[in-house]
């Protein structure tokens, strides 16, 4: 494996923020000591997201970043989980970091974890937890309230003790993560939950780490509507796993 870390970034209709957040991502990663690659995965966007990323890659060729930035794109929107799976499967790195393009968690969070030696065991998954006692969160009360309700649902449905499954900032090791995502069948709202359940079954330890998280304006998440869809996905997942 040539790269030490791959950053997988799923994209769906993000044309308005691609330029700003992509530049922030690569500027931060270029300051890391280890080698890296960034894989953008365009999950069937119907806006100009694909062209914006291609333009970004072209602009950065002058800075010798072209070998470190890749774009995977396909026409049909399948879901965030599928996009992350596609990125993971072409990764050539020891470690894989997934993060959202809106930069609710800044990529420098990974470096903070590394400096504190919180990431070391290859048989663990490291998940940013907005409920961790040392996390610094800037969000509305209703989001925090819904997070607490979700925690209760996950425990009652799956006996899952992970307090925050949905933060997109996660670090996995290549020794297990491709096998895990090869088994995933839920590609939409509940894919994180299914991945964590599969990791538990495979004796992969889930470690929740503190994070600085800010709700960004322009986010594509519709709180109430997406919460309902997420709950329905959990019902489908529970029924499938109960067979």
Mark where each language-model region is:
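Acidic donor-diphosphate engagement hotspot in glycosyltransferases and nucleotidyltransferases
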Residues: 21, 49, 84, 108-111, ...
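A conserved acidic beta->alpha catalytic loop
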Residues: 42-53, 103
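Short beta-strand/loop segment that forms part of the nucleotide-sugar
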Residues: 34-45, 72-73
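Acceptor/aglycone-binding surface of glycosyltransferases and processive sugar-polymer synthases
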Residues: 74-90, 95-98, 107-189, 215-232, ...
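Hydrophobic helical membrane-anchoring modules
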Residues: 1-5, 16, 20, 152, ...
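Hydrophobic/aromatic residues located in beta-strands of well-ordered beta-sheets
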Residues: 38, 71, 125-126, 206
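Short, well-formed alpha-helical segments that are part of the catalytic scaffolds
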Residues: 14-29
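Donor nucleotide-sugar binding loop of glycosyltransferases
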Residues: 14-17, 45, 80
